[in-house]
């Protein structure tokens, strides 16, 4: 069994894994957006007295479901609390491994186009990684700066940055290489936002309840540094 055969199988496995966990991540995100947009006042006054701010009733797959959202936090946390984070982490990990396998290992074929810019494999990889890292650092700084206090300004600056990044990538890499690094930059921003902003905020909510403190509402709204949502 030669190395090329194994690399083909690894490519296939990573592609399927990346697609599956990516669907799980996006699906979970869309579900909670839908859930938040369809919450209504609890039907049972006792639920409102317990701090429940809204609920949704649904029927699916032959069963009835109800989902309830607290205004801040319950009086007591359950022993089993599900965290929605590994969907994002595994999407980032599988995507990065796939990027390394297809575009960095095979840079001469998939990433470098001498008619666009003559690069060595090492130079191309370094530039590609820099775009992924700098994209996150710029986004994080922008959200934590004064610009993050105005959604319109923030959105406009991010749009301009993305346009500049797309232009630069198209003048550095092949068409495929530019496309995948632009998408990868956005994916890294989203996944690291989960890791560095959203999940730490949720951990603080849980920690406050475990220590008997009143949770800070800003963590529940995921507004650390303002627009990190």
Each language-model region and where it sits:
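Polytopic transmembrane helical bundles with strong interfacial aromatic enrichment
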Residues: 1-225
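A short, hydrophobic C-terminal helix/tail in secreted or cell-surface proteins
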Residues: 228-229
């Amino acid at each position: 069994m030669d190395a090329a055969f194994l690399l083909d199988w690894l490519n296939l496995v990573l592609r399927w894994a990346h697609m599956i966990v990516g669907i799980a991540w996006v699906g979970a995100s869309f579900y909670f957006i839908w859930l938040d947009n369809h919450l209504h006042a609890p039907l049972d006054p006792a639920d409102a007295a317990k701090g429940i701010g809204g609920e949704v009733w649904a029927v699916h797959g032959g069963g009835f479901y109800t989902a309830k959202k607290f205004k801040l936090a319950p009086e007591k946390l359950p022993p089993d609390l599900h965290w929605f984070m590994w969907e994002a982490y595994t999407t980032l990990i599988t995507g990065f491994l796939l990027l390394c396998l297809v575009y960095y290992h095979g840079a001469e074929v998939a990433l470098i186009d001498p008619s666009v810019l003559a690069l060595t494999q090492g130079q191309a990889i370094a530039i590609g990684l820099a775009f992924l890292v700098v994209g996150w650092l710029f986004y994080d700084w922008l959200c934590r700066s004064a610009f993050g206090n105005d959604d319109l300004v923030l959105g406009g600056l991010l749009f301009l940055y993305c346009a500049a990044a797309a232009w630069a990538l198209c003048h550095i890499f092949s068409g495929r290489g530019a496309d995948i690094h632009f998408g990868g930059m956005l994916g890294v921003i989203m996944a690291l936002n989960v890791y560095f902003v959203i999940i730490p905020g949720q951990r603080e909510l849980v920690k406050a309840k475990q220590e008997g403190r009143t949770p800070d509402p800003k963590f529940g709204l995921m507004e650390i540094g303002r627009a990190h949502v």
